[in-house]
Amino acid sequence: VEILIRRHNRQKGGNRAAYADLERAGAMFVYCGRPGPLGNPFRVGRNYSKQRAVDDYRLLLGEDYAKHFPADKVEYVRTRALERIQQIAKKVRRNPTAHRIVLLCPCYVEGEPCHAEVIREKLLEVLEVAK
């Protein structure tokens, strides 16, 4: 399975036009922004870099997340994200022609950190374990 990351175009119909070739090839598109289950809860801001937001998202989805965050504050967000990743993996396993997933993230810029990279890593882990 190939997992691509592309920028989500917020204009109505923008993604469809930009990624028509991928759509024709049967790619599965997954939105990774807020307010969806895969949206990064760590917001980039004055004192919070993009890299730190990605690093914290990686910690959040990791096994040792409770060492880094108060469990009662992040459990819901973490569970939603991991469940969504499992759902996507299940869809891929059920559909033998689903060989390409496109993660659409509003913040994605090639060469810069993006939490969709963490989602790709987790998806590949889940799909590998299922083999």
Please tell me what each predicted stretch does.
Residues V1-K131:
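Residues lining hydrophobic/aromatic ligand-binding pockets adjacent to catalytic sites
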